[in-house]
Amino acid sequence: MAFPTGKRIVFTGGSGKAGRYVIPELLKRGHSVLNLDLVPFPDPSTNIMTLKTDLTKSGEVFNALTTHFNFAGYENALVPQPPDAVIHFGAYARNMLVPDNECFQANVTATYNVIEAACKLGVKKIIIASSETVYEVCFGQGDLEYTSFPLDEDMDVNPMDSYAISKLCGERVARGFARRFDVDIYSLRIGNVIEPHEYATDFPSYISNPKTRKRNAWSYIDARDLGQICDLCVQRDGLGFQIFNATNDTITARFPTRQFLEHWCPDTPVTRQMGMWEAPLSNAKIKDVLGFREEHDWRKYYNPDQ
């Protein structure tokens, strides 16, 4: 497959669960990447340079966005330039890693700092990681019901936990800066990220105990397919501020979607005809607008009937 000319991308949080798969996918598609993180990239064979950066410190972020991607940058006369795109995944990944106030302030501050620095340095493409948790149920208090199915980007959302609220605040910062600076900022509401080995280790319990997957709306995103999504976002210009659900196509269940939801969420309205196996956290927009086509359907890796 031939890919378009690669871009220079600064990626924050690339050493985390998602980034360690997304960055190699970006490299395969011809991009060059600088990783901003507090720990090195876990795969030395990629030759990805990690610049240790505290994203909650505005000065460090501004400086990191005007840094050579590797030592080869010193070999020509061109001083460090801002990147073509910034992909911001760096954050506390969920609640209960640190106290709630720290999770909120760090995530919001980091997102603000990255967006502000990128916009003021003239970067025209910014992609930020939001979360499925904004749909309220994942870390909501008690056994909550979803508002309706499918879950899509136009729904009014009102999460109650610090992590999800921090992600919603990040979306609002992105919307405002996209308008002020006339740039593209795409916010990805990322589903439950699945690494390749987790199909064998985790999917047996996911399928046999459906109630445990309610918090994820019985949906997921393969970490490698998330890399494809990031590439599509980098390549597609001119959309301004956008929110995209970043999920794979199908429900993680033995039974077709409508039958499954009627059993597990009988009181939740279904607002349109859904595909036979369509994931409740809908990726229809990202397929229609960006052309996403999943490569890693979960049934390739785990047969629920065996």
Features from the language model and the residues they span:
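NAD(P)H-binding glycine-rich loop region in Rossmannoid oxidoreductase-like domains
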Residues: 42, 55-106
